[in-house]
Amino acid sequence: LFASTRNQETGREEMTTTVSKPNIIPSRRNFLKGAAALGGSAAMLAAVNDGARADGDPIPVGQASPLTDFAAADGVEFKNGLTLACEEINALGGILGRPLEPYFEDTKQMGDATNVQAVQRLIDRHAVHAVINGYNIGSGAAIQDVIADSGIIYVHYDTTIGHNNLVKSDTARYFGSFQGDPAEYWYGPGFLKFVQQLEQAGSYKRANNKMAVILSAGVYAANIANAVKERAADFGWEISLFETVNVPISEWGPTLAKIRQDPPAVICITHFLPADLAQFMVQFAPNPTNSLVYMQYGPSIPAFREIAKDASKGVVYATVVGALQDEIGTAFEQRYKAKFGENAGHNSGAQPYDGCYVWATAAALAGGTGEPGNDAQNRKVADRMRAMIWRGVAGTTRFIPGEQAAYTYPTQTNDPSLGMPHQFLQIQDPAKSGLLIAPAPYDTAKFMLPPWMKA
C-alpha cells in the first residue's frame, strides 16, 4: 500500500510504503512448496526463515530511481521490481521474521550529484539498511562513497566498468557495494562474438566488412562503442563510421545520410534510450541499407515497439541483464504483469527484483541486516553475498572477487551456471517482446533475416 505524505520542512509530496503482514504459513512443507513456485533460489531464503511470519520490526530498504523525466519508463519498472520482491520475500517470512519496507526517491534527470542526494535522503530520512537500485546515469562510481560512509549494502545495475575499478581500488572501503550485472565493456566483445556465430551458422552473410558504430555522449555508450572499435579488426571488421550523437535525439537524418552514402554490413548503436532508438528505425525503414541493425538495451522496453511499430521488425538487441524466457523467467513475467499490467516492462523490473533477493538471502544467512553505522553486521552480509551463486530471473549472479560485479556468460565464463547470460534478442513480431536467439542453452528462437535485408 503506497501513501502520499507531505514533508513538513520542504512541503513536497513524498511516497511512503506500508507493507501488510502476510498470513501465517501453516506448515514447513507448504512453506517450502510456496517458495519453490517462485523459482530460482527462493527456497533457500524460505529454509533459513524456517516458517517464520514477517511480523517483527520492519527493515527499511531504499531505491533511488528516475521516476520522472526521460528515463521514467525504466524507473517505474525498477520501483515495481523492488515492490514485488519485497512482497514475495515478506510472504516467505521477510528476513528472519522482519518484513521489508521499501522507500523510493526520484533521481529525475540523474547525474552524480542528483543520484547521491537521492540516496542520502533515503539514509537520512528512512535509515535504510540497503539501497537496491536499477540503473542511474552518471559515473557509476559516486553513490558508493555515500554507501561506504554509512556502512550499509548497495546493489545496483549501472552496468559500468567504473564500479569494478572503484571497488578494486579499495575493497575494504567499498565492501558493501555490488553491481548485480556485468560491466558494459562486455557488450563490445560479446556482440562481435555473436555476429561471428551467426556467420558460422550460415544465418547471416556480411555484404562487406564495414561496420558503422553510433554512440551517444556519455561514459556508458562510449565504453561499449570503444570496446567494439578496439576488437573489431580481430573479427575482420573495418569501422567505416564512428559517430557520436547528442541525446535525446529525434532527428536522425544527418546520421542516416552518412550510412546511406557508404552502406555498412552492420549498424551498431550503443545508445540505449528506447524513444530515440525507435525514431532511428522509423526514419531508417523507408530507405534501408542492406545492414544488420543492432541496438543496445532500448528495444527491450515496450515503448520502443509502441513507437517504431512495424519498423521494429528484425531489430537485434542485447542486454547483459534481463528476465530469461525459461521456466523461472516466464513465471516471473506472469506474476509481474498480473500485478502491474500486460504492458509492464518486466525485463527492467527483473533487475532490482533479483538484487533484492540476493541481498535478503545473504542477510538471512548472516543473521540479519544492519542499520546505517552498523558496519560489522553489514560486512557479514557482504561476505555472504560474495560467496553466493544465485540462480534468479536473469540467470546466475556470481560476483567477481575484488570487483563485486557479476560475471558474464559466455564471453567471460563458458559455464552458464557461473555467469549471467549476455542475451541477444530479436523482434520478429512488433506486437510481442523480442525472442531470445542467443546464447545457448537459453535461446528459444532462431535468428530471422530482417525484412529489409537481402538473403
Task: Indicate residue ranges for each PLM-predicted region.
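Intrinsic disorder/low-complexity segments in short proteins, especially the signal peptide
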Residues: 6-7, 43
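Extracytosolic ligand-binding ectodomains
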Residues: 7, 11, 16-21, 27-34, ...
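Sec-dependent signal peptide hydrophobic core
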Residues: 35-43
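N-terminal signal peptide c-region/cleavage motif recognized by signal peptidases
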Residues: 47-49
